[in-house]
Amino acid sequence: MTTTSSSADSDAAFERAAELLTAPSALVHLALDEARVVVSYMSPRWIAAGTTFIREGDAHDEGFMALVLDGEVVVDGITVSRTEPLTIKVLGPGSLVGEVGLVDQEPRSASCTASTDVLCAILTRDALQALIEASPAIGAKLLLAIAANLAERLRDNARKLRLYAKLAKTMHQELEHYTLAALKAAPPPRA
C-alpha cells in the first residue's frame, strides 16, 4: 500500500493496515506476515462523509473489497416492504466491506456509505488475481478467510431468519385468536 505522505507515515499506515486485516472484525485467519503481503496489493482511498461507494444492485463496479482503516461505514439495504434503506450494520476500523462483490462478480447485495470521512485500503479483483499468481498459498489463505467470514454471516442470517419465522408465527396465532374472539363477541347479523 503506497501513499503520498512521508516514508515513515507510509510504513506506519502499511503496518496498521496489516494489523487491522488480522483483527477479529476482518480476517483473523491470516498471520501478520501474510497480511503484510496482502496489504502490499491494496491501495489507499479517502472517501468523504456522505459518499455511497458501494450501491446495492450495482453490477458495473470494478469489483473490490475495502478494509476500513479510519472512520465509519453504514451498510444498508432495501427490503421488500420498505422503500427507505434499512441500516444493517455500522462498521469501523478493522472491518471489511465488499467481499461478496470481490469474489462473485454479481450485483452488489447492499449499499455502503461513509458516515464520516473514511480511509480504507482497497483490494481490487485484478489485484487479488495478481496476489494469487505471485503468492498462491497466501492468496488461497485469503480466500479461505473471506469464505469463513461469509459463512459466519450466512449462519448469523439463518439464525435471524429462524427468529423472524418464530415471531411471524406467534403474531399470526395472536391475530387468529383475537379475530375469533372478536367474531364471537360481535352481535349476530340482522336478517
Question: What are the functions of these language-model segments?
Answer:
Residues 1-191:
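Cytosolic regulatory regions built on CNB/CRP/Popeye-like sensor folds
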